[in-house]
């Protein structure tokens, strides 16, 4: 029986290994992590991450050919294939701070693999890493190997949170990069055989190591670029009276462009897009390509601009002050169908409103109060560095309340900011909400999911990104 071990039981490692175990009953899969609470959660009825369909997959396999353990060294020692799915956060200090990937966890994992291994292994990069990381890892393994042979493969994930299980069951492609040597080709074929249990051969792409590593960064950069492009258009639409939804539809019907990732919003979030683009910028700078680096920086700048523009719109619409006004924030996760708040636009929007002394009442069906308070009290990128959490700010705690009900969150509020496109928000009784709000009552739709005409008929003053402005909003101070 082939044995697979995955180091890292997070958003990538857990679901990916669960699906491999389900689709490959003849393969034994162990997911290991040094975090005892996380592994305990994976072994319980309440998994540590929310992902539609994940519970069912885990329950079918757990205890049969899928195991979760904190005994990292044992399972690495016994494995034929070791996936490494550890954090590669953005550095917060030192050379490349704010841009470069911090490979501390990856290096530690590589040294441990070399130290405990007693047989040849295939080591698979599953985390998103800079180009040429495999070369560095190879050197660490080789210089500490005690004669054991390692083959390094790059097998980046292309999952979208909220649809991760669906993506794993029916991937657009599986990408495997390896050394172009007889040993490298053999290692690629071994991993290919695992995925071939359920993925058609034509959808398994093989490349050299460096192409696979760069492809992941490029894919995320291209997706984020599309979001920033349509968001840049949304600002122009508001200025001219055009409707960004109509513009996006017209553009997306061009078969050369297509309709995906053309929904205007308050901005992109999640653990990958910003981090990977900053990493790409740093790689370009290190390779003497400042013009290319500057090009990709603009994707981040537009995303930051979109969030600040949204905050400015809220403040300017409400008589240029939200001081001591209650603002209901509906949604905090970076997208629907996940509880993940990493780099969610809601953080920057909430911080912007808090700087103007607003009182926030936040509701998200999948995000805990503890998580929200922690996110609002951390500096940028600290979410990915558990050891560097900032002390909670008493001011933030005082100004923020978290509820488990949208109606409670909106009661006596002056305005509502819709920050996540949860389906349940479309079906709320907005007449009831309006009746219990301060007047004039505002809705700021940061996800373009609401029936604007219906809200206006109820009596709301409505702002939706990239849509023609209400007369009220036209009369308010201009938003830069």
UniProtKB/Swiss-Prot annotation:
<dbReference type="InterPro" id="IPR014027">
    <property type="entry name" value="UDP-Glc/GDP-Man_DH_C"/>
</dbReference>
<feature type="binding site">
    <location>
        <position position="33"/>
    </location>
    <ligand>
        <name>NAD(+)</name>
    </ligand>
</feature>
<dbReference type="InterPro" id="IPR036291">
    <property type="entry name" value="NAD(P)-bd_dom_sf"/>
</dbReference>
<feature type="binding site">
    <location>
        <position position="161"/>
    </location>
    <ligand>
        <name>NAD(+)</name>
    </ligand>
</feature>
<dbReference type="InterPro" id="IPR008927">
    <property type="entry name" value="6-PGluconate_DH-like_C_sf"/>
</dbReference>
<dbReference type="InterPro" id="IPR014026">
    <property type="entry name" value="UDP-Glc/GDP-Man_DH_dimer"/>
</dbReference>
<keyword id="KW-0520">NAD</keyword>
<feature type="binding site">
    <location>
        <begin position="256"/>
        <end position="269"/>
    </location>
    <ligand>
        <name>substrate</name>
    </ligand>
</feature>
<dbReference type="Pfam" id="PF03720">
    <property type="entry name" value="UDPG_MGDP_dh_C"/>
</dbReference>
<dbReference type="GO" id="GO:0003979">
    <property type="term" value="F:UDP-glucose 6-dehydrogenase activity"/>
</dbReference>
<feature type="binding site">
    <location>
        <begin position="8"/>
        <end position="13"/>
    </location>
    <ligand>
        <name>NAD(+)</name>
    </ligand>
</feature>
<dbReference type="InterPro" id="IPR017476">
    <property type="entry name" value="UDP-Glc/GDP-Man"/>
</dbReference>
<feature type="binding site">
    <location>
        <position position="447"/>
    </location>
    <ligand>
        <name>substrate</name>
    </ligand>
</feature>
<feature type="binding site">
    <location>
        <begin position="334"/>
        <end position="335"/>
    </location>
    <ligand>
        <name>substrate</name>
    </ligand>
</feature>
<feature type="binding site">
    <location>
        <begin position="272"/>
        <end position="275"/>
    </location>
    <ligand>
        <name>NAD(+)</name>
    </ligand>
</feature>
<dbReference type="GO" id="GO:0099503">
    <property type="term" value="C:secretory vesicle"/>
</dbReference>
<feature type="binding site">
    <location>
        <begin position="216"/>
        <end position="223"/>
    </location>
    <ligand>
        <name>substrate</name>
    </ligand>
</feature>
<feature type="binding site">
    <location>
        <begin position="86"/>
        <end position="90"/>
    </location>
    <ligand>
        <name>NAD(+)</name>
    </ligand>
</feature>
<feature type="binding site">
    <location>
        <begin position="157"/>
        <end position="161"/>
    </location>
    <ligand>
        <name>substrate</name>
    </ligand>
</feature>
<dbReference type="Pfam" id="PF03721">
    <property type="entry name" value="UDPG_MGDP_dh_N"/>
</dbReference>
<feature type="binding site">
    <location>
        <position position="38"/>
    </location>
    <ligand>
        <name>NAD(+)</name>
    </ligand>
</feature>
<comment type="similarity">
    <text>Belongs to the UDP-glucose/GDP-mannose dehydrogenase family.</text>
</comment>
<dbReference type="InterPro" id="IPR028356">
    <property type="entry name" value="UDPglc_DH_euk"/>
</dbReference>
<keyword id="KW-0560">Oxidoreductase</keyword>
<dbReference type="GO" id="GO:0051287">
    <property type="term" value="F:NAD binding"/>
</dbReference>
<comment type="function">
    <text>Involved in the biosynthesis of UDP-glucuronic acid (UDP-GlcA), providing nucleotide sugars for cell-wall polymers. Required for the formation of cell wall ingrowths on the outer cell walls of nematode-induced syncytia.</text>
</comment>
<dbReference type="InterPro" id="IPR036220">
    <property type="entry name" value="UDP-Glc/GDP-Man_DH_C_sf"/>
</dbReference>
<dbReference type="Pfam" id="PF00984">
    <property type="entry name" value="UDPG_MGDP_dh"/>
</dbReference>
<feature type="binding site">
    <location>
        <begin position="127"/>
        <end position="128"/>
    </location>
    <ligand>
        <name>NAD(+)</name>
    </ligand>
</feature>
<dbReference type="GO" id="GO:0052546">
    <property type="term" value="P:cell wall pectin metabolic process"/>
</dbReference>
<protein>
    <recommendedName>
        <fullName>UDP-glucose 6-dehydrogenase 2</fullName>
        <ecNumber>1.1.1.22</ecNumber>
    </recommendedName>
</protein>
<dbReference type="GO" id="GO:0006065">
    <property type="term" value="P:UDP-glucuronate biosynthetic process"/>
</dbReference>
<dbReference type="InterPro" id="IPR001732">
    <property type="entry name" value="UDP-Glc/GDP-Man_DH_N"/>
</dbReference>
<feature type="binding site">
    <location>
        <position position="342"/>
    </location>
    <ligand>
        <name>NAD(+)</name>
    </ligand>
</feature>
<dbReference type="GO" id="GO:0005975">
    <property type="term" value="P:carbohydrate metabolic process"/>
</dbReference>
<comment type="pathway">
    <text>Nucleotide-sugar biosynthesis; UDP-alpha-D-glucuronate biosynthesis; UDP-alpha-D-glucuronate from UDP-alpha-D-glucose: step 1/1.</text>
</comment>
<feature type="active site" description="Nucleophile">
    <location>
        <position position="272"/>
    </location>
</feature>
